[in-house]
Amino acid sequence: MPPKFDPSQVVDVYVRVTGGEVGAASSLAPKIGPLGLSPKKIGEDIAKETANDWKGLRVTVKLTVQNRQAKVSVVPSAAALVIKALKEPERDRKKTKNIKHSGHISLDDVIEIAKIMKHRSMAKELAGTVKEILRTCVSVGCTVDGKDPKDLQQEIADGDVEIPLD
């Protein structure tokens, strides 16, 4: 039998959810049930936390649990940040599948997203992180400053486009 859980210990639990929706409590139960928390209540807390900014987007949520209290914080992926920067109207996930986003974002938006993602990137400089975000833009299907993100990546590599150092 596993050792008894210490309630004063800080435990981080990561859950992938759709913003603004109360996920199935049955999917949360195996992760947070042993910590002495109610999956239904945590599901409602997650829905409340993600309802405003991340409605309809798939985001990772970090639950920090200590003394049977859960603190909810959103850990957005690069794709979620890019889709949010597109400012597209919310779509019903159940009706439309495999959405290709055909919007445009500016290079400044990409640099801002890169600054947010810098701590999770393996790149040494900001230019490398910007290239990673541009690759995400290719996957999402949007253009940057009216150009294909692949072309912009090549221009950064050639030195035609300047990226700030920090």
From Swiss-Prot:
Ribonucleoprotein is among the record's keywords: yes
GO cellular component, one term: cytosolic large ribosomal subunit
Domain of life according to the entry: Eukaryota
Pfam families reported in the protein's UniProt record: Ribosomal_L11 (PF00298), Ribosomal_L11_N (PF03946)
Keyword annotations: Ribonucleoprotein, Ribosomal protein, RNA-binding, rRNA-binding
Intrachain S-S bonds: none
GO biological process: translation
GO molecular function: large ribosomal subunit rRNA binding; structural constituent of ribosome
UniProt-listed InterPro entries: Ribosomal_uL11, Ribosomal_uL11_C, Ribosomal_uL11_C_sf, Ribosomal_uL11_N, Ribosomal_uL11_N_sf
PANTHER family per UniProt: 60S RIBOSOMAL PROTEIN L12, LARGE RIBOSOMAL SUBUNIT PROTEIN UL11X
Its job: This protein binds directly to 26S ribosomal RNA.
Family listed: Belongs to the universal ribosomal protein uL11 family.
Protein name from the UniProt record: Large ribosomal subunit protein uL11
Organism per entry: Prunus armeniaca (Apricot)
Gene name, Swiss-Prot/TrEMBL: RPL12
